[in-house]
Structure formats: C-alpha cells, structure tokens
C-alpha cells in the first residue's frame, strides 16, 4: 500500500542512487544511517524504458527508508561505475539533504566508514538555525545531513536517527534556465536566492573556503524541495554510460497531480507500474535543463 504522504502532489517521493555494489551500499545505509529495506527486486524492462535507460533492465534494486517511517527515501540500483566522475564537479543532481535528529550522533556513526566526511558539523543560519554536515558515499553520492535546531512541523523535522529526504540540490551551468524549466514544466515557484560561503562546493573546486556561491530555492505546491546551485567555472557535464542512469544521484522522483499537465518531453509515454512506490499509479521520466533525470509519479 502506498503511504498517504507519498500521494501529495509536489512531494519528493525518493532519490535513485546508481551504486556499483548494491549489497555494500545497503549495508552501509543500514549500519550508518539506520535505514531499512522496504522492497527489493530487479528493474523490469518497461520501467527501465520509461527512464530512457534500457540498459537498467534486469538490474538489482533495493528501496530503503527510515526504520521509524512508512515512506521512502532512497532507491539503490546496481550499475557499473563510471570512470572520471568526481562528486560535486558535474551538472545534474549534486547532493541530497536528509533531516537528522542529532548531527553529532550521525557524525560519530559515519566516521571511519566507507562514507567520507567532506564537511564536519557546524552551525549556520538558513532561514532558521541549522547544524549540517556533508559526506560522500562509495558511489560518490553526496549527502547533506542536517539537524534543524529549532524544529517546527514540516518535512525537515527529523523523527528518526536519519529521516526523510527534504531537499534535492541541483548543480547547473545556467541557474536561470533551470529555474525557468521547473516553473514551466512542473509549476514550481521560485523562492529566495542566497549568497554564502559554500564550504563543500568550494572544496570540490579548490577554491578559498570563504568564496561566495549563489543558489536559489524552488518550491513545489506544498514545500521547498529543490536548491538550484550555480556551479563555478570548471564544472562539466556528467559522464554517462549509454542506456544507463547517471552515476551517483541518478534521478529524483516527485509526485504530480496529473502527468497530462506536465509541459515537457518524456522519454516514453506514461505507464502504470505495480511495485513500490508506484502502487499502480502512472509514472514517466524526463530530462531537466541541467541534464538531470526527473521521474514524475501521479498522485492517484
């Protein structure tokens, strides 16, 4: 049964991670993030075709979620690694932000593991006081693990050791073009723009730690869900194996009220899929302005 939370238009359903060894990745997320398996199997050919990634057919997948929740957060899909791919250096989905109960406890859980800490915990003001840290995983996927210090009711409020995905960070060569795409195709609304010393991004590009970088928030009908980063000079298109999803953060899935209202070109015509998280609902995928893969699932 598909949880009610996943049915709300504008919500992020989950992110799909392309990982070279699914057993290793699942064990790491279970041990360090305390995520649990919801469902496992192999990608069926019609679903792979809907992603514009026919080579993904037959690949093993695992759907994972916080142990204390009945919703989804991550779908791991096993793929061959792509050479010459470095985290936070290419366009597309650059990072995922997950809410945590205690960033210090998470820091203890991930240190000296296959996660690489690229930014230790620190306090910042981002609308409200938060304490984030940043890590990269064995597939070179990047997570921002964020504790909200004055929590209110909302998707960023953690109710588990590591809880839900609440912001997807998009790396772009042209932020304005990316913002226009989501406004036109999905009806998302442009939010505030921020300039800040972006520690993890500056580190990836060898820039001084206090170098100012700029990003803009995008809001869906129900919440702010995408952070659109303008990437520095030197960023490149993400390398892609033919017929596969992009490496690391391969795709992010959102709920929409109707696929018929989407103003974009799908890889394949919308189709119904029975496995979680679709539950018989229609889904389709398309490519965004920065080369990112976007999956859309109808609310009903």
Language model segments and positions:
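Post-signal peptide N-terminal segment of secreted/secretory-pathway proteins
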Residues: 54-55, 61-63, 74, 82-90, ...
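Extended intrinsically disordered, low-complexity coil regions enriched in Ser, Thr, Gly, Ala
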Residues: 23-43, 84-93, 105-116, 176-196, ...
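A short, acidic/glycine-rich surface segment
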Residues: 45-50, 81-85, 151-155, 199-203, ...
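Eukaryotic phosphotyrosine signaling hubs
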Residues: 12, 92-95, 165-166, 247-249
């Amino acid at each position: 049964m598909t949880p009610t939370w996943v049915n709300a238009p504008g919500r992020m359903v989950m992110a799909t991670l392309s990982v070279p060894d699914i057993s290793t990745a699942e064990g790491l997320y279970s041990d360090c993030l305390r995520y649990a398996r919801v469902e496992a199997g192999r990608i069926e050919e019609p679903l792979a075709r809907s992603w514009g990634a026919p080579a993904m057919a037959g690949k093993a997948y695992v759907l994972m979620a916080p142990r204390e929740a009945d919703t989804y957060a991550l779908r791991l899909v096993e793929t061959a690694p792509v050479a010459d791919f470095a985290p936070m250096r290419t366009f597309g989905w650059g990072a995922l932000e997950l809410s945590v109960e205690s960033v210090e406890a998470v820091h203890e859980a991930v240190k000296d593991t296959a996660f690489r800490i690229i930014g230790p915990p620190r306090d910042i003001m981002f609308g409200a006081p938060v304490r984030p840290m940043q890590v990269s995983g064995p597939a070179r996927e990047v997570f921002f693990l964020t504790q909200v210090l004055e929590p209110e009711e909302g998707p960023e409020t953690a109710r588990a050791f590591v809880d839900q995905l609440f912001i997807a960070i998009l790396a772009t060569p042209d932020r304005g073009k990316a913002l226009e795409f989501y406004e036109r195709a999905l009806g998302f609304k442009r939010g505030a723009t921020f300039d800040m010393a972006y520690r993890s991004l500056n580190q990836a590009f060898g820039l001084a730690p206090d170098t100012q970088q700029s990003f803009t928030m995008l809001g869906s009908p129900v919440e702010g869900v995408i952070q659109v980063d303008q990437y520095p000079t030197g960023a490149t298109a993400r390398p892609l194996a033919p017929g596969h999803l992009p490496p690391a953060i391969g795709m992010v899935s959102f709920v929409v009220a109707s696929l018929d209202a989407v103003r974009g070109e799908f890889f394949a015509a919308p189709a119904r899929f029975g496995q979680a998280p679709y539950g018989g609902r229609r889904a389709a995928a398309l490519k965004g302005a920065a080369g990112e893969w976007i999956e859309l699932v109808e609310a009903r």
